[in-house]
């Protein structure tokens, strides 16, 4: 009896843990997890020189606004549960450019740069990191996408100064900012930010990223070195964000399109302006 009860509890726990990807990825899949986005946003403070002096000053004065802004494009994931369509376009270049263009103080500038950094590093994820792991692991796009990005979150988490959920709900400033820039009510903004922070916190407490990373290291002996490789590839190309901050619109997509669409889009974009260089010699 006790063994049957334990088995049933394990089954229920597994079902609960795997329901997290199902909930968060019910719509369009995005890319890197929030922890990974916050890590790359951190680099803009001291490791990556921003050419615009106003933006450079802004991110150094308000690093927490920068890192909170790096979470905002993923509001697209919670728009339906927050009962608003205001965030349908939150993961698009034109939205991030509009946020930057409307910034009138250093806090707003830092937040907009964070949102831009989210989209910029997603280009690497969608066109290199995720396809590589769909090829190396298993070709189940939604599941592989979630597993790879959350394993990366675990791999990179020790380098974070603060967790994404804490920065999303640090004060009321972010909710006010979101309401203004996404043209929604303050109540809808607070609800969406709270739900995104709650989903992120639930994911961390579930220990699913750690489980995926641990299983991945057992089944894929080169996982750690490959993840370090992709971190280095993104870091090396991060200074190219200056071109986007200067108004350039990259040809590559920040959203995750169907595989056939992505492949068709990548061919004509190869070697064009506004495109981060493809990582050379991707390890397998």
Question: What role is predicted for each listed range?
Answer:
Residues 2-6, 10-114, 120-284:
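N-terminal leader/auxiliary helical segments
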